[in-house]
């Protein structure tokens, strides 16, 4: 059985074929997002100019002196250029001067992008004709308020100096927030690391307490009643004057839907239909989970965490995981939760819970990345690096006829049906 997986996002877009034995019981479900046609320039522009909860961007832009356009980094699948182009046309037609428009990569607490990365996100023309900068979460911040829990809310100084802020992002299931989108382009996108330490640690504490009580529900694709989302909205309101554009994408990273407008109102409208775009069935019992890590190849802990969910049930605690990742770039430096040595970890570093009693974690990639295993959260005694698919199948050789296997087309966006 041959299955084609989309791979090499931002690195050539070359798919990867995998081959499974014909006598295996393979579950491979196509997500709804892959059954829809992508939007063209005209459709994207129409969505932007018919927003939810606020006036059209063309009206908001009138009389504005400085405009910043925020976009996410290489750990997100957002096809930024396709959305940035109609935005720029709207701004220029509304009288905003070209030299007064800047782009800022909303990196959160990730490492900086290079010019080459900017071009992959925005295209050669935009990078050549507009100022494009990286956010730094440690410096050049201003206080915009104090949160209810008492911590300072710090945001990028340049962002706050602009009188119109536009955010471009993708709305997909998120491992700690239910869904990405909305004000997340600000928090953590262009926020200070101390502010985000408060917000992330509060959410992490809530999830840890749920796990201890045996009530843990993996948040991807769920609007759970927990602190992170609410605090992001609370802090976001302090920033103000943000026009947000969130897109749905298919597994080829093409825009299939747009929600735009007020960051809170468009977020909840999008959330109503987001989960169904990306959900698949989770088998009650499975022997092998093959999860593709393409969109967030440099944050493969997300896809790995999705695979681990399949082994959380009391009756399914044994099985192997294959993580497919062909990205040359490796794992993104994460200054809040990353690893910076064998004993040196970032301030909120934690590890994914692996409830399996037995089972290997096979990292299928032409590019060895031993330190990356720390970032992904694979325990050393489970880790196998396979450079070829033949090596993967050798590592899975104990599995014979009737093996139940689940293949996940894109671990970064999938959520399981309830």
Where are these regions (language model features)?
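Glycine-rich phosphate/diphosphate-binding loops that line cofactor/substrate pockets in enzymes
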Residues: 52-68, 93-98, 280-288, 314-317, ...
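C-terminal non-catalytic interaction/assembly regions of soluble proteins
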Residues: 92, 305-418
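Long, well-ordered mid-to-C-terminal structural blocks that present hydrophobic/aromatic surfaces
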Residues: 265-334
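A glycine-rich helix N-cap at a beta->alpha junction
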Residues: 118-142, 350-359
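Short glycine-rich or small-residue beta-strand-to-loop segments that form or flank ligand, phosphate
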Residues: 66-77, 102-108, 289-292
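Short, conserved secondary-structure transition motifs
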Residues: 103-116, 136-142
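N-terminal amphipathic/basic leader segments beginning at the initiator methionine
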Residues: 1-48
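Conserved, well-structured core segments that form the ligand-binding/active-site neighborhood
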Residues: 128-285
